[in-house]
Structure formats: C-alpha cells, structure tokens
Design a protein with these regions (language model features):
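N-terminal leader/targeting pre-sequences
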Residues: 17-60, 65-166
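Sec-dependent N-terminal signal peptides
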Residues: 4-12
Length: 166
C-alpha cells in the first residue's frame, strides 16, 4: 500500500513539471484578411501566449480571451463576451480592476504585422480550475484599441480575428 501511495505522489509531481504547448491559427472575421498564429506554452505553473498576427491595419488592436471557444460566426459573436469568471470590471491586466480575459493591445506596424507575448500564472491549459482553465475559450482580436476603462469591453470595436483554444 505504501508503494502505491508513493508512486501516485511521484506521478503528480511529474505531471506538474510537464510542458504543454499548443498552436492555433488566427481566423479572419468581419470580412477582413486578418491572419496569424497563437501559441500557448504551459511550463512550471505559468502559461505563455505568443500571438503573431499580420494583415492588420497599422495601429493598436485590442486582444481579449472570450468565454466560448467558438469562432464560427462571421463576426466572431459566437465567441461570446469577455471571459470573466470572477465577475470583475473590465480594465488593464494587474490593475485594481480587471478580469481574466483582459490581455491588452497588439501594436501593428506599417506593414500590418504585430506580435504580443504574455505570461501569467493565472491561466492553465486543461486544469480542473474553471477560474484558470483557458481550454474551451477563444482569443478575439478587435478592430480598435482597448481603452481599459469602458465597460464591459474597453470600447475595442468589431471583431476581426478569432482563435479557438482547444
């Protein structure tokens, strides 16, 4: 019996050290040509997102995690609203008021290319904690900038790109 318990504990500690990496394609929405990739890597209790997008209009574009992993609608409305398991106000990540879907803004250069990396211990890939698990959610790229205070969306504009996180 003691051997079985020790093996179970060893299995749990090895699982928590495992690196998980998933890559997804950005799908164009709202009759745009938005394209790119989103890679999520979970390692040592943190998730890093690496979002590379092109064919954007130059300037700032809001990025949020939305509540449903469904990008089927032409305007990405099927992704639902911002993922907000704690029911907090919209805001800037790590400010007094923000929710788990608040990521920030991509800054597209004159050629329409942008990259955003983001790392947090507040997300996980497939864990049992619904307050952290981003599997089954989506990333939505918006036409406008997130002003970090307009409720509930940051006045970010239309949805021009969508990623289903599976």
């Amino acid at each position: 019996m003691k051997k079985l318990i020790l093996i179970g504990i060893a299995d749990l500690s090895l699982a928590s050290c495992k690196t998980i990496s998933k890559q997804y394609v950005v799908r164009p929405k709202s009759h745009t040509e938005t394209q790119g990739t989103a890679t999520f890597t979970q390692k040592k209790g943190k998730v890093e997102m690496d979002l590379s997008v092109f064919k954007l209009k130059p300037g700032l574009h809001a990025v949020h995690i939305h509540e449903f992993g469904n990008c089927s609608a032409t305007d990405a409305s099927s992704a639902g609203g911002h993922w907000n398991p704690s029911k907090d106000d919209h805001g800037k990540w790590q400010s007094d008021h923000f929710h788990m879907g608040d990521i920030g803004n991509l800054d597209a250069d004159k050629d329409g290319q942008a990259r955003l990396t983001f790392s947090t211990d507040k997300w996980c890939l497939g864990c049992d904690d619904p307050m952290k698990n981003i599997i089954g959610k989506s990333i939505v790229i918006h036409a406008g900038v997130d002003d970090f205070h307009t409720q509930p969306t940051g006045n970010a504009g239309g949805r021009i790109g969508c990623v289903e996180i599976k």
